[in-house]
Amino acid sequence: METRPPAAPAKLSYGIRRGGWTRIGAATVAAGKKAAGDLDPRHHHHRVTHGGDGGGVGGGGSGGQEEADEQQQQQHDHHRLLQLHHHQGVQQDQEPPPVPVFHLQPASVRQLSGSSAEYALLSPMGDAGGHSHHHQHGFQPQLLSFGGVGHHHHLHQFTAQPQPPAASHTRGRGGGGEIVPATTTPRSRGGGGGGGGEIVAVQGGHIVRSTGRKDRHSKVCTARGPRDRRVRLSAHTAIQFYDVQDRLGYDRPSKAVDWLIKNAKDAIDKLDVLPAWQPTAGGAGAGNAAAPPSSSTHPDSAENSDDQAQAITVAHTAFDFAGGGSGGTSFLPPSLDSDAIADTIKSFFPMGGTAGGEASSSTTAAQSSAMGFQSYTPDLLSRTGSQSQELRLSLQSLPDPMFHHQQHRHGGGGGGGNGTTQQALFSGAANYSFGGGAMWATEQQAQNQRMLPWNVPDPGGGGGAAYLFNVSQQAAHMQAAAAALGGHQSQFFFQRGPLQSSNQPSERGWPETVEADNQMSHHQGGLSPSVSAAIGFAAPGIGFSGFRLPARIQGDEEHNGGGGGNGDKPPPPSSVSSASHH
């Protein structure tokens, strides 16, 4: 039992093992030794008797079995270390084929196996060096899991003898480019991260830097308002642009654009210079009140949003009524300036001092300015609270065909009774806001109340087409109009009601108001301007006060105070008020 072969041929019993996961028997060990030849005795302490020795010696068979059992026990003890150090069983002179171990690519295993001779030289003290080798990998197993083999070689570089480290270092470097992409990639990201970040910055995207990404979403102020810095090109234009950029050799699109602008400077200088801020330049709209507004302001606002464009188109369609009388000249009063518009825009909630008969000329000017400003910036107007702004431009739909037909049927004269009544129905919005209609202009100019924009064609050619319900006169106007239009007017309001999505209580208030006005219209068929004005200020109507919708005119108690003829309120106020508050 004491007979053992020399140390040279019996070093590694598991040297031929694939992957270090299966246990081998005595016959497998013998076959492996025959195939592998002499093994390095420094790799292992276990000595296994050769199969031939077992046959020659009487107890060779049992001795071989004991050695096999001992070997299996040792393998079981070192099973975990074998998993971490899968090179241990590789021969010095013969390399096993690549085996995927620890989820490494075959190339990495091939590299590891290529350095097996090195590992044999790195463990001159037998198991001591081997165990230290194991522990080194045991402390850093995660490096193996994601390709940290380059670090694996560097560990040996410090533990090896003076000569092998040079070979280890060389092979480690060679393997670093092939099997250590994970370790070198983070370094290239970190060390080359500065370079990578610079490359991204050169390309103009600042993709690496979050601030750069946010910066790309910023806007710039232009002649037509804030615009996104990013520009979307059509496919054909983008191809041409990038071709120019590549031919110029620029790495940033902005550089190519700068080059194009510089070379086209002569042609650009020939173009007209745009004003600094087009939407707030209300004077331009005032100068082009009669016909040009659609051509001058509509395209500018239309580029901002499609919804705005549609609303503007409708608005200009209604505002083009200014063909008769002073409607065109006073479409936008001279008082429409940037300050008035700014004040109008800033007032997101209604102001109490601008209601009722106490409305001053400046208030009227601001209101008229808001009304005119609405013609080309409905979005801004719809979000303001001054006068008619919170009444929403959702009412600016296309003119109702039925009502348009009724207008021509009832108001064909333009200045007759029905025409005047319909002008009253539209509360003389264009009359005193835009100066249309000779008789109503003077009386209603001082009573410019919160007007509900409503785009309906000009009933008589002089002007009250663009807006419905000067709240100060809405009830009286509707009363007279209801008599002229009959029950159809009630249907008209029912059809128009849903358009006022943000003011639902008023939808119910309008028809009932019209019905109540129908009764009163029999007694007040012909309303003089003064009477209608008085009734208008005290009328119940569908006063719009901010975002709550009382059925009073602007909230008579809130805004009208004691002026404007509160004592002249007709009976309908209570009924309409209760109806609109449900």
Curated annotation (Swiss-Prot):
Residues 30-78, 123-195, 283-306, 402-423, 548-582 are annotated as: Disordered. GO terms for molecular function: DNA-binding transcription factor activity; sequence-specific DNA binding. Keywords: Activator, Developmental protein, DNA-binding, Nucleus, Transcription, Transcription regulation. It comes from the Eukaryota. Residues 213-271 form the TCP domain. The keyword Transcription applies. Forms homodimers and heterodimers with PCF2. GO terms for cellular component: nucleus. This is Transcription factor PCF5. InterPro entries: TF_TCP_subgr, Transcription_factor_TCP. It is found in: Nucleus. Transcription activator. Binds the promoter core sequence 5'-GGNCC-3'. Residues 51-64 have a biased composition (Gly residues).
